[in-house]
Amino acid sequence: MESVMEAQSPLAEDGFSQVTRKGGRRAKKRQAEQPSTQEEGGDATCMDTEEARPAKRPVFPPLSGDGFLSGKEETRKIPVPANRYTPLKENWLKIFTPIVEHLGLQIRFNLKSRNVEIRTCKETKDVSALTKAADFVKAFILGFQVEDALALIRLDDLFLESFEITDVKPLKGDHLSRAIGRIAGKGGKTKFTIENVTRTRIVLADVKVHILGSFQNIKMARTAICNLILGNPPSKVYGNIRAVASRAADRF
C-alpha cells in the first residue's frame, strides 16, 4: 500500500487544519499533471480573447541560375536529321534570338556531330530555361513552325506528344497509306479542322504523328486521330470532337 502522510497548511480556517494527502508515485504524477492542465487552460482563455489570424502561405523566391547551378554548366544536345538541315539554316536567326536574349543561354550548331547544343552561362537566370529551349528546338526539328514552337517558351502548360500510326493499328502497304490520307484529308482539310477545334498543332511525318498543345487538347486531338486510323468516317469524327470541345468550353 502507498504511504499516506498528513501535513498542516498554514492557512487554517475556523481552527481546522487543512489536510493534504501525499501518496506515492500516483499522487506525484497527479500533482505534476495539474499545473500543466492549468497552464493549458490559461493559454486557451488567452487564445479565445485574441482575434483568429489566418495562416499565411509561405512565399519562396525563385531560385537563381547561379545559386542552383553553383558554377556548373549544363548542356542539352538535340540531334538534327538530314531533312531538317536546310530549314534550320534558313530559320537560324529566329531560333537563336529568343534563346539567347530572353532565356540567357548559349547555343550553337555542331557541324561534326550534327547536333544543336545549348548550355547555361552566367547570364542564365531561370532554372527551367534550359528545358524550355531544348523543347523549343526539338519542336522545330520535328516539323513545327518557329512561331508555333515559340509557345513552348512563352507558356508553361504546353507539351509535345508523339506516336506512330502502327501503334494504334498494325497497318501495312496501301492500308497504311489510306490511314495517313484519312488523317490529312484532301488538301490537309481534316488535319486543319482537328487543329482548329482542339486548339493544337499537328505534324504528320510519314507514320509518325506529333501533337503540340495543352494536356486536355492533346487528348482530344489524339482521340480524333486514333478514330480516323481505326476507320471511322471523318464526318463522325468531326461531330465527336466538336461535342467534346463545346463541353470543355462550357465547363471552363
From Swiss-Prot:
Signal peptide: none
Keywords assigned: Acetylation, Nucleus, RNA-binding
GO cellular component term, pick one: small-subunit processome
Stretches assigned to the KH domain: 173-225
Subcellular location: Nucleus, Nucleolus
Domain of life per record: Eukaryota
Positions where N-acetylmethionine occurs in the chain: 1
Xref: CDD domains: KH-I_PNO1_rpt1, KH-I_PNO1_rpt2
GO molecular function: RNA binding
Region (Disordered): 1-66
Keyword Lipid biosynthesis: no
Keyword hit for Electron transport: no
GO annotation (BP), single: ribosomal small subunit biogenesis
SMART domains named among the record's database cross-references: KH
Main location: nucleus
Alphabetized Gene3D superfamilies for the sequence: K Homology domain, type 1
Job of this protein: Part of the small subunit (SSU) processome, first precursor of the small eukaryotic ribosomal subunit. During the assembly of the SSU processome in the nucleolus, many ribosome biogenesis factors, an RNA chaperone and ribosomal proteins associate with the nascent pre-rRNA and work in concert to generate RNA folding, modifications, rearrangements and cleavage as well as targeted degradation of pre-ribosomal RNA by the RNA exosome. Positively regulates dimethylation of two adjacent adenosines in the loop of a conserved hairpin near the 3'-end of 18S rRNA.
Protein family per UniProt: Belongs to the PNO1 family.
Subunit organization: Part of the small subunit (SSU) processome, composed of more than 70 proteins and the RNA chaperone small nucleolar RNA (snoRNA) U3.
Protein name: RNA-binding protein PNO1
Organism: Bos taurus (Bovine)
